[in-house]
Amino acid sequence: MSEADQALVGPKADEPSPPAEEKDEGGGKEAAADAAPGPSASFRLMVTRREPAVKLQYAVSGLEPLSWSEDHRVSVSTARSVAVLELICDVHNPGQDLVIHRTSVPAPLNSCLLKVGSKTEVAECKEKFASSKDPTISQTFMLDRMFNPEGKALPPMRGFKYTSWSPMGCDANGRCLLAALTMDNRLTVQVNLNRLQWVQLVDLTEIYGDRLYETSYRLSKNEAPEGNLGDFAEFQRRHSMQTPVRMEWSSICTTQQVKHNNECRDVSSVLLAVLFENGNIAVWQFQLPFVGKESISSCNTIESGISSPSVLFWWEYEHNNRKMSGLIVGSAFGPVKILPVNLKAVKGYFTLRQPVVLWKEMDKLPVHSIKCVPLYHPYQKCSCSLVVAARGSYVFWCLLLISKAGLNVHNSHVTGLHSLPIVSITADKQNGTVYTCSSDGKVRQLIPIFTDVALKFEHQLIKLSDVFGSVRTHGIAVSPCGAYLAIITTEGMMNGLHPVNKNYQVQFVTLKTFEEAAAQLLESSVQNLFKQVDLIDLVRWKILKDKHIPQFLHEALEKKIESSGVTYFWRFKLFLLRILYQSMQKSPSEALWKPTHEDSKILLVDSPGMGDGEDEQQEEGTSKQGTKAGLQEKSKEGDTEETPEDSLTAGGDTGGREPVEEKLLEIQGKIEAVEMHLTREHMKRVLGEVYLHTWITENTSIPTRGLCNFLMSDEDYDDRTAQVLIGHISKKMNKQTFPERCSLCKEILPFTDRKQAVCSNGHIWLRCFLTYQSCQSLIYRRCLLHDSIARHPVPEDPDWIKRLLQSPCPFCDSPVF
């Protein structure tokens, strides 16, 4: 591996340690240092470049142009669209590069005009302000693009200012929503349901403007009556109170909804906080799944009292099953504080009694970005929250924990990290590691280490010039499980000169080793492969390179399967076997559609009457030479295939050497065995749902009798749980079979195959892998990795069948589209 592709990062031996500066809430010094002199050997980080680098069509825009969602999609704000890069761990692709699915959210063609009054009144006021003889009014009005988004002689304000991903489970497919803020202050919520096209669900700027117009631009009835729009101060006030600065999603919360029969049911909802230019915060509440304007439950406005707000983030704290939430707001003048958010009718949530000031000094250091990470304090034996914020070239941190004495606040700054202002900050939610970057291509890793009093940071320097060459950085984002770091780069200075043209690229580097990723997958509490795509992609890359599964991973996984038997470990084993199978495949040297040189010559020799004898002899000689060359090539390929056999043997295969074809057949047999085990486990789950939700003999859409017969058809399958469950269901069905019938010929569809149903007339229907009903329609859904298909829910389906149809793929945990 070349030096450009891999670099050991960490401060040099002669690099001075950054000075530490720590203050508590009252401004006094604390004893704990916040930055250690340098990283210990256990914290040294090895970063490796991953291909491909994704080129962007347009220049990036906005302050934080890069964001990584929980469902492994990277959004990049550009001057014409939001580029969305989805990381896919494709088990059917033998290539070692990252598999990235690319889509985009285009910017609206028309400019956004904030609603500050009736159209006639607004037009008259604009004409009045533009022709005013007072230069403080006319010039302010003409130069402010908030008042003139069209630009007149200036180019229109296109592009995106900021994007924010919702948590998983918010759209109809159980994935993330994208909130996008354009440069002309239009805030929309976008969804991607078919993986090819993004659709706008709602325009929140328009809805909020209509609400303000209906209330005469007053937030409460106690406020003074609205002023005259012809007054320039009132004109500015109405614009600033609906100009978004930032927006952030909360985690999914549960609310109580009362039915008509006075029964209560739990309804999932999510909150979107929008920070406006005047300091107000609008908190939108959406019912899930979010499908459009009808999913909006409420919108409440909070007055923060912060002048020149610049950024916000959700603070969510959980301790002893009690949850507290608030909004962390930062100012361009320096202060940072938490505002209480009263979540009415939200189960298990409590609110702060009053705002909590995290930093009160008006030191003119603008708060650029805020992140909040939940952690566990090993000394205090309780949960805590780590808040980090970029302020100039410094990192402000604050540790919040609740004890018997109340809310404890420890805060300080980490200095000496960058010589230029920090342009982007991101945090790993798994362990609290913070990454910062400046525009000179330097990235810092800050690892929090708890002390008796508060905490300190081990920090390391990642020089991107050692990995990519001379580059400038514009944003970073860490993957959900901390395996990758995405970086927006352009060319740096060459020979002391800036590049003529800027080519914006999204680069990826690894932050974890294969051993760390494998250990995290084995000990994961999530137990969902799709939610850990970045980790399993590292494992995929390792197996494709080495062409064998490491012995330690194989043994550890077998122990997990024997001890727990959880289907997550079976799915992990299936994933490893599939990647191993792909690593053993021969990569075609030529395109499959091209005819080979050897075949064309043989056809010419065998066909009679094609030229004279000399030509035939020449062609025959040529064909023999081609055949000989082909045999030589095959022998060379056979020689190259010895390497994977050796590596497989080293990976724990104690027997003699076997041909690659036999090894592939052996792996294929193991894959089919694991798939059959996962199929039976899911069949048991489906039968359990049938037993719980049917009281009498009922003909559901699920082929219950066929599932029972299929499970008991294998004599080697001895599962006591399945036998007891089938016995109870058989008693409930009372000798009824309710067979499926073909929609074309009305013949019975026997349940003899888990993948398809074939009637006596030869009509073939694919089976839904979630309910095992035959999909007798032209349209159906498919999982992300094309492992299985599923039918669409219909209105007559009961709720429990609809819940089954919302399940992920039983083989790869991927969502179904």
Swiss-Prot record:
It is an enzyme of class 2 (transferase). The modification N-acetylmethionine is found at residue 1. The modification Phosphoserine is found at residues 600, 607, 647. GO terms for cellular component: mitochondrion; nucleoplasm; transcription factor TFIIIC complex. Its main location: nucleus. It is found in: Nucleus. It comes from the Eukaryota. GO terms for molecular function: DNA binding; histone H3K14 acetyltransferase activity; RNA polymerase III general transcription initiation factor activity. There is a cross-link at residues 221, 624 (Glycyl lysine isopeptide (Lys-Gly) (interchain with G-Cter in SUMO2)). Keywords: Acetylation, Acyltransferase, DNA-binding, Isopeptide bond, Nucleus, Phosphoprotein, Transcription, Transferase, Ubl conjugation. Residues 1-40, 603-658 are annotated as: Disordered. GO terms for biological process: transcription initiation at RNA polymerase III promoter. Its EC number is 2.3.1.48. It catalyses: L-lysyl-[protein] + acetyl-CoA = N(6)-acetyl-L-lysyl-[protein] + CoA + H(+). Part of the TFIIIC subcomplex TFIIIC2, consisting of six subunits, GTF3C1, GTF3C2, GTF3C3, GTF3C4, GTF3C5 and GTF3C6. Interacts with BRF1, GTF3C1, GTF3C2, GTF3C5, GTF3C6, POLR3C and POLR3F. Essential for RNA polymerase III to make a number of small nuclear and cytoplasmic RNAs, including 5S RNA, tRNA, and adenovirus-associated (VA) RNA of both cellular and viral origin. Has histone acetyltransferase activity (HAT) with unique specificity for free and nucleosomal H3. May cooperate with GTF3C5 in facilitating the recruitment of TFIIIB and RNA polymerase through direct interactions with BRF1, POLR3C and POLR3F. May be localized close to the A box. This is General transcription factor 3C polypeptide 4. The lineage of its organism: Eukaryota, Metazoa, Chordata, Craniata, Vertebrata. The gene is Gtf3c4.
